[in-house]
Structures are given as C-alpha cells and as structure tokens.
Design a protein with these regions (language model features):
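Extended hydrophobic leader/signal-anchor segments used for secretion and membrane insertion
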Residues: 1-230
Length: 230
C-alpha cells in the first residue's frame, strides 16, 4: 500500500507524491530500462546483482539491447562494468490505454499519473462529469449505489446530486516492480473490506534460477521484516 484514505496521490516521472511530498521508495523498487551492451550479460554477474533469467528474456540481438527491470543497486552494478555495458536508458511509458479509469485521462501513464484523491470514510467529494469516472466504481460497485448520468446531470439512487459521502476507507496499492505490476494504476482503489491482512515478515524466498543444492533458498531474506509496517 502506497496511498492511504484521504491522501492525494500523484506520480511524476516515476516518483510517488502524497499530498505534494515525494514518498520514500523501497530499496528493492524496480523500473524497466533499455540496457545496451557490448556482449550478453554473464550469468554470474546477473546472479550477483539479483537479476533473474526471466528479467533478461527480452534481448534484442541485432541491437544488443536488453529491455529489463532493474533495482538502483543492479543498475549501478551494470554501469560499473564498462567492459560489458554501453548505456542504460529509461524505457518510454506508453500504456495509458489500460490505466484506471479506462474512459478518461488518456495522457496518464504508469510513470506520470494523477493526481487522484483517495476516498476516506465519512468524507465528501464534489462530483463532476470530469471526475466521475475516478469514483464511479467505488460508488456503484463497492458501495452498492445506483449511478447514472442523465442530460449531463449525475444521479445517485434516482436523485440528482453533485457530491457523495463515502461509507468505506480506500487504499492505493502498487507493486515494487513498477513496470510489471497489475496494481491500482490499472484497477483503481481497494476498499477496506477487500484488505484481508498485512505482511509482517518473509518466511521463505526462493531463487528460481538455482537448484536446491545450488543456492535456491535465499537465506539472507528469510525471516526479515517487511519495511514500513505499522
């Protein structure tokens, strides 16, 4: 969860802002990059930097370019290898067609999104034809109201209105692998009755590229506490 009830969230050039302040990113946050190389990245270097074989699957042989997710640590590690890496550039974000809400704000992307106010229980939002798509799903699907637009006017449960008071708290979820996550940027707000718990610690972590006798268990991650749990 990166956004709480009542906060205003905006993403600017990949950075999350809450109520106008930049949010601290987790150490393991990943973004997708175009990595131009002189030769393929060796497996031992990839393993050292925490880059999986799956991460390196998108390799354009003719151009010697990987399209891959990297943490800041992995990015710095690759840039240090001048004998292998020529350059690392941001990938363009051009996915507005699949973002929430589907029927507006076509200039939004996963890297530049919002701002959106996250609904809070008991708080009232002013409704307009312009912002209705943002709040239509919480009002209609999650809180069970009949919602319609007639002659340019908003009607809730058969009555014309220009505001709505929310009955539940909502949250904004985003994955740490920012360019490979199906999260709130694609399906919107998460109502409180959909939240079933919160993570405390990692009890098992496996490396899919390794065998059981070859370092498959990531011992350094076992029983480590999840950051920012309150």
């Amino acid at each position: 969860c990166v956004g709480l009830p009542g906060q205003t969230l905006e993403i600017k050039d990949r950075i999350i802002y809450l109520d106008g302040k930049a949010n601290k990113e987790p150490d393991n946050v990943q973004y997708r990059y175009l990595v131009k190389t002189k030769r393929p990245i060796p497996d031992d270097l990839a393993h050292e930097l925490g880059i999986s074989k799956e991460d390196m699957m998108m390799y354009y042989t003719d151009a010697s370019v990987y399209n891959m997710p990297l943490t800041e640590k992995a990015k710095a590690g690759l840039l240090a290898r001048k004998d292998i890496v020529v350059s690392i550039e941001n990938t363009p974000a051009d996915d507005a067609g699949g973002l929430y809400p589907l029927n507006m704000y076509k200039n939004w992307t996963t890297d530049n999104y919002g701002p959106v106010w996250i609904p809070k229980k008991g708080e009232t939002v002013k409704l307009t034809i312009e912002n209705l798509p943002v709040y239509e799903r919480p009002i209609h699907v999650y809180e069970g109201n009949e919602l319609a637009v007639k002659d340019g006017k908003i009607n809730i449960n058969g009555k014309e209105t220009d505001e709505y008071t929310f009955k539940m708290d909502y949250y904004w979820m985003m994955g740490d692998n920012r360019h490979n996550s199906a999260d709130s940027r694609f399906w919107g707000f998460v109502p409180e009755d959909h939240v079933v718990g919160k993570p405390i610690f990692i009890w098992l972590s496996l490396d899919n590229d390794r065998g059981w006798l070859d370092g498959k268990i990531r011992w350094n991650r076992l029983f480590t506490f999840v950051d920012n749990i309150k």
